[in-house]
């Protein structure tokens, strides 16, 4: 896989994380980009030759003036889930979602998932599992330094 924005990410010692299913023709991820000093959410699509095209910043309300990280697009219900410090939060990174259109690259108003999903600590990487009616996310809400736990809800 080609690196995206290698100069910008190297400057911050950051490596984007991708979460997508095999065979998908797109991927969403957070990255430092050429237009912003903060982490923003991008989409990258595969072309007809099965090569990754240039990433595009997600348009609309998702990206703020602070960091957005760990995005996941649920194509079954059209929601883009992500964590942010830049929208109205309970503290740290909170979990958010926005209706997102792959066709127009446009996101709608951002919705905080609130407690019990978001907490005063860092909560991130919300991944729904519609087939089983649950979701997973990670958090350091237990208060232990550098201790991250995953939750099934």
Regions found by a protein language model. Give the residues of each.
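Short, conserved micro-motifs composed of acidic
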Residues: 1-153
